[in-house]
């Protein structure tokens, strides 16, 4: 889950919650407290539900995850979210510009503050806190210091302190990542290559694969495609690293295939390629959904 808008978050969470259930509330020093509730009975009140989050999940996506978790409606899987939950008011200035003032913070239904703490003069600490969410030992220390709350249906313990902490923690798979591949990404070489490559290959791929299913089952980027990518890297000053490339080759092929699928069949096709192979959290979510009575429902009990 990425970021998003408040209205969409309320609508999405409301799909799974009963009428009147608090989805999110706001409170500020000079702003009256207010709550946003589900306006109708959700269309899916009892179905199996898993919400995926990670360090990039922010704002509206945290509202959805927090509401689902606090009402014990579904299982939250992945890694701690970013922690971005501020209400801002825009004030127009005479020269046509504007300034945004933070006036309140978002709270989950159990009362947890979504926004990570940001104390005056501690900007560096704020960003270090985000980095710690990638580190096992540091994350454990954050959890130990986090205030405890109770969910609203079964009374399970959940933790505040900023962001949403998943019910089931699944670490990122970094086995296929190398410094060499990271350098290709950081310099924009992969993005530039993909655009040129797909511009020249789209028609032939479309003729060969009429459906996503056929593409997914039959297509793998060739060695020649990978050689063109590394050659572009060389021309941009990224020296070829055979060892690093060997580590990242499966990841590179999968990423290129997913991007080709996106160009041919839409954004959803990208995730249909990338998630099963590259996301341990996605695989865990599927396993939970398939064995809900043993792997999902018990998580929601006290």
How should each PLM-predicted stretch be described?
Residues 1-4, 270:
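Conserved short loop/turn motifs at secondary-structure junctions
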Residues 2-3, 13-23, 27, 53-57, ...:
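Sec/Tat-exported extracytoplasmic proteins
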Residues 16, 49, 68, 111, ...:
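Terminal peptide-recognition signature
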Residues 60, 72, 79, 83-148:
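Polar, glycine-rich mid-to-C-terminal structural blocks
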